[in-house]
């Protein structure tokens, strides 16, 4: 029977409904269920009469258990899917089976002694002695790890205080077992048996804890080994662990088997019907379980709880199998691996060689496995911490090139990682710690050597492989971005090209520092870097002005581009390298850079640019930029008119101060073909350069008014000139050109007294025609609503009348367009006929054929009129 928990009512609670249990203050109630499932603060309990119901948890207090059964409670906590007790028992049994016969005999002797000692301690000793955990003196012989050569790792890791506690427990246990007891009665024997069970359970718990501690201690005997030792793990434990690690690859049958073992056999057919695999199982949620026809909320909650336990065990098994997989993994190089990077000998480094770490055949497959938990090896930056030991020779380290996984790049790159990389366990930096800390600007220069403690560019020889980029063009964190598609201006320098570089601390580079290998001493100058490092640097940008020679352009280059090598290092071809003897005689500019070096800066060409014809009189140079190329160098003072090739970039084009478009004008689409035809807008075309004093001579109406601005609603005073439907305004009478224009064609003129708009004054509101209206005409200004106010009512009346006349009056020079199809005649001809319009359609020949009475009456009247005129 499981443990029973009781509560005492702190406050009285009257049950308001049938499912609520009334509480009386001070009484004790049996607790059946807490709110683990719902979390609403309502518990379920039972009173002394057997009535069940729910009650608020805030009204009761949980008291100690009256009756407990440790075996049942422990059995209820274990999980069917991941039986940790089974793993522990199997590992314990296998470890005991490997022990010698003497160990087995000692275990039997220990069990007999424990039984007799428990009897004696219960009969003669106090009951509180049962709570003390009893550990035998020969407990070291129970574990195979203690039989290894040298001291036990468990005892080595334990402090002296813990060992003294074990000795005290051992002494108490021996004292208790030494005493003898008299024959007990049947009642006392029952108590002895129950107490004996509790003692055995306590000893079992201690053995399990010690076994787990010894297993974890023996798992990593060597700090330099990246993989855990698993030789001491039994076969059954390995099988369970491997099955848990293979959860994403479970089939539907394995998922159903797991459900049956987990006590969820009622929903197993639903999973089998929908073909739920292990990968889908790890991603299930409550909504998906509803789709699987699991209608009960309690059943869905239980399934989700089991799945969460499976996820936790899956992650725990991965950590136990590969405890350092989330950290930089150091793989020792094999003896047959070829590498062009030399290593420093052990005598030179002053340390002992690191032990080779054990490897498993399937570990590489596990690393390449597509999982979200396993990080990519290419994203791990492994580098010794140079700040931890300032006096250490910084040339002893060798930094190999990083490489992408083989699954992402078809090219297999030889990769090497330092062997002395430790784990991230310690917070304190060590000599082998791979943690790279950000150094302050004051720490950028070493105190002893005066050299920069961290260089800003990775160092590699031309024979080593450079940094790879995948097909999508993405690079690794901390490295300069380099696109593999669409990069039409990629530099292609030849190999083994010496490079001019002046060492210095960088200020803008985000690449992790890499020290220079000691093997490169003597082969190249101290300031030489490889061409792979320069390929990732952007070239310096140069902006030229009309009539400026390239030599003067070079003088305006920032000295940091050539002296620091941070973001614009210069690569020279063998032909362009200045002679060391002639270096002293070359002129030096104010920036400290010689003309020969500056001429080499201009020694670049774009592969896709067209050659431009030379102009002896001088050419017009626009915004030009430099791109590296293995072309020949220019002379020290190149002739005027040499057109520099361009390498356009978004950053350089955006920062160009030249070739700005004029305000109010837009370019045609045909400009991309080189026609350079500028099309003016309607406003810029309509504005005229007539002075205000000249415009008022031919104006229909002119004067000062206040116009409300469109953006902020501010009333600004302007001088307006109206001529026809063209309303222009000036800022003052001294303006030489119009400042604004309003086309009043087909506008409506109204008056408004809005307090918000005009502050209580009467304002003239000029409304444009609605889109699609019959009176809508072509206007050269945007159709906006305009508001005007005047100083007095007379001016307001004068301007409103002028606006009405301009909008109503029709231009007689423009023909009137109509949609009517009725034939019309001129006004002069209509006056001559003096007849009604219908008579124009009647011919003399058709007068006799008219049969209509109305037509006969009209004809008779016309005849009478003609006869009367003749008389």
UniProtKB/Swiss-Prot annotation:
In terms of InterPro entries, this protein maps to: Boi1/Boi2-like, PH-like_dom_sf, PH_domain, SAM, SAM/pointed_sf, SH3-like_dom_sf, SH3_domain
Q: Where is the composition biased (Low complexity)?
A: 88-100, 109-124, 329-343, 456-467, 549-560
List the Gene Ontology MF annotations in alphabetical order: lipid binding
Write down which residues bear the modification named Phosphothreonine.
Answer: 442
Listed Basic and acidic residues bias regions? 62-80
Modification Phosphoserine, positions = 224-225, 241, 433, 439-440, 444, 549
Q: Which UniProt keywords apply?
A: Cytoplasm, Membrane, Phosphoprotein, SH3 domain
* Domain called SAM: residue spans: 250-313
Stretches assigned to the SH3 domain: 2-65
Source organism, top-level taxon:
Eukaryota
Q: Where in the cell is it found?
A: Cytoplasm; Membrane
Which parts of the sequence are annotated with region: Disordered? 42-168, 329-371, 384-670
Q: How does it sit in the membrane?
A: Peripheral membrane protein
**Domain PH: where?**
698-808
**SMART domains recorded:** PH (SM00233), SAM (SM00454), SH3 (SM00326)
PTM Phosphotyrosine: at which residues?
229
Alphabetized SUPFAM superfamilies for the sequence:
PH domain-like (SSF50729), SAM/Pointed domain (SSF47769), SH3-domain (SSF50044)
Q: What role does it play?
A: Has a role in cell elongation and separation.
Provide the protein name.
Protein pob1
Protein source organism: Schizosaccharomyces pombe (strain 972 / ATCC 24843)
Its lineage reads: Eukaryota, Fungi, Dikarya, Ascomycota, Taphrinomycotina
């Amino acid at each position: 029977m499981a443990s029973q928990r009781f509560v005492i009512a702190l406050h009285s609670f009257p049950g308001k409904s049938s499912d609520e249990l009334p509480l009386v203050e001070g009484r004790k109630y049996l607790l059946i269920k807490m709110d683990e499932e719902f979390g609403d603060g309502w518990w379920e309990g039972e009173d002394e009469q057997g009535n069940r119901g729910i009650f608020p948890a805030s009204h009761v207090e949980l008291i100690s258990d009256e009756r407990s059964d440790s075996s049942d409670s422990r059995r209820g906590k274990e999980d069917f899917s991941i039986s940790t007790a089974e793993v522990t028992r199997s590992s314990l049994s296998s470890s005991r089976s490997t022990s010698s016969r003497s160990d087995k005999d000692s275990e039997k002797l220990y069990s007999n002694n424990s039984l007799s000692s428990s009897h004696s301690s219960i009969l003669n000793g106090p009951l509180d002695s049962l709570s003390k955990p009893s550990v035998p003196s020969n407990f070291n012989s129970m574990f195979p790890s203690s039989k290894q050569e040298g001291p036990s790792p468990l005892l080595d890791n334990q402090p002296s205080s813990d060992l003294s506690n074990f000795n005290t427990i051992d002494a108490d246990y021996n004292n208790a077992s030494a005493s003898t007891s008299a024959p007990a009665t049947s009642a006392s024997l029952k108590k002895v048996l129950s107490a004996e069970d509790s003692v055995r359970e306590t000893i079992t718990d201690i053995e399990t804890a010690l076994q787990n501690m010894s297993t974890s201690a023996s798992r990593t005997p060597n700090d330099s080994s990246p993989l855990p030792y698993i030789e001491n793990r039994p076969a059954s434990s390995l099988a369970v662990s491997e099955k848990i690690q293979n959860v994403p690859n479970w089939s539907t049958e394995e998922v159903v088997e797991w459900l049956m073992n987990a006590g969820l056999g009622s929903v197993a057919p639903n999973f089998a019907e929908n073909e739920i695999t292990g990968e889908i199982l790890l991603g299930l949620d409550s909504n998906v379980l509803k789709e699987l026809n699991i209608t009960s909320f309690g059943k869905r909650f239980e399934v989700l709880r089991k799945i969460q336990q499976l996820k936790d065990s899956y992650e725990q098994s991965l950590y136990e199998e590969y405890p350092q997989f989330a950290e930089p993994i150091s793989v020792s190089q094999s003896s047959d691996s070829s590498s062009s990077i030399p290593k420093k000998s052990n005598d030179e480094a002053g340390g002992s060689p690191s032990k080779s770490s054990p490897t498993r055949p399937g570990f590489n497959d596990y690393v390449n496995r597509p999982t979200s938990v396993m990080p990519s090896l290419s994203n791990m930056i492994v580098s010794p911490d140079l700040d931890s030991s300032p006096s250490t020779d910084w040339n002893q380290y060798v930094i190999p090139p990083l490489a992408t996984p083989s699954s992402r790049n078809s090219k297999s790159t030889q990769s090497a990682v330092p062997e002395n990389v430790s784990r991230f366990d310690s917070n304190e930096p060590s000599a082998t710690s791979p943690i790279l800390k950000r150094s302050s600007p004051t720490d950028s220069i070493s105190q002893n050597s005066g050299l920069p403690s961290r260089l800003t560019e990775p160092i590699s020889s031309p024979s080593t492989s450079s940094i790879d980029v995948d097909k999508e063009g993405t690079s690794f964190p901390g490295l300069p971005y380099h696109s593999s598609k669409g990069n039409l201006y990629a530099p292609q320098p030849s190999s083994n090209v010496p490079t001019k570089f002046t060492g210095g601390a960088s200020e803008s580079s985000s690449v992790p520092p890499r020290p220079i290998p000691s093997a490169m001493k003597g082969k190249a100058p101290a300031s030489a870097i490889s061409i792979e490092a320069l390929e990732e640097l952007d070239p310096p940008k140069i902006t030229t002005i009309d009539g400026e020679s390239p030599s003067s352009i070079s003088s305006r280059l920032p000295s940091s581009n050539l002296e620091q090598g941070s973001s614009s290092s210069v690569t020279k071809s063998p032909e362009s390298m200045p002679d060391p003897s002639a270096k002293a005689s070359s002129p030096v500019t104010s920036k400290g850079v010689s003309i020969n070096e500056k001429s080499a800066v201009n020694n670049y060409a774009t592969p896709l640019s067209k050659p431009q014809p030379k102009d002896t009189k001088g050419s017009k140079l626009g915004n030009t930029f430099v791109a590296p190329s293995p072309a020949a160098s220019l002379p020290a003072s190149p002739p005027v008119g040499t057109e520099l090739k361009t390498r356009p970039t978004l950053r350089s084009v955006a920062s160009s101060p030249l070739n700005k478009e004029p305000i109010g004008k837009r370019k045609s689409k045909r400009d991309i073909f080189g026609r350079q035809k500028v099309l003016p807008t309607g406003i810029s075309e309509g504005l005229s350069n007539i002075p205000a004093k000249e415009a008022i001579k031919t104006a229909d109406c002119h004067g000062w008014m206040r116009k409300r601005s469109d953006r902020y609603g501010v009333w600004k005073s302007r001088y307006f000139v109206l001529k026809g439907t063209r309303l222009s305004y000036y800022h003052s009478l001294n303006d030489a050109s119009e400042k604004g224009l309003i086309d009043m064609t087909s506008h409506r003129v109204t008056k408004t007294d809005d307090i918000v708009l005009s502050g209580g004054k009467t304002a003239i509101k000029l409304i444009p025609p609605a889109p699609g209206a019959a009176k809508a005409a072509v206007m050269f200004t945007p159709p906006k609503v305009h508001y005007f106010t005047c100083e007095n009512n007379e001016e307001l009346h004068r301007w409103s009348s002028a606006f009405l006349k301009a909008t109503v009056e029709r231009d007689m020079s423009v023909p009137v367009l109509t949609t009517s199809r009725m034939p019309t005649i001129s006004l002069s001809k209509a006056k001559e006929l003096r007849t009604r319009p219908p008579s124009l359609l009647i011919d003399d020949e058709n007068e006799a054929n008219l049969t209509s009475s109305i037509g006969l009456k009209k004809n008779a009247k016309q005849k009478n009129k003609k006869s009367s005129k003749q008389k």
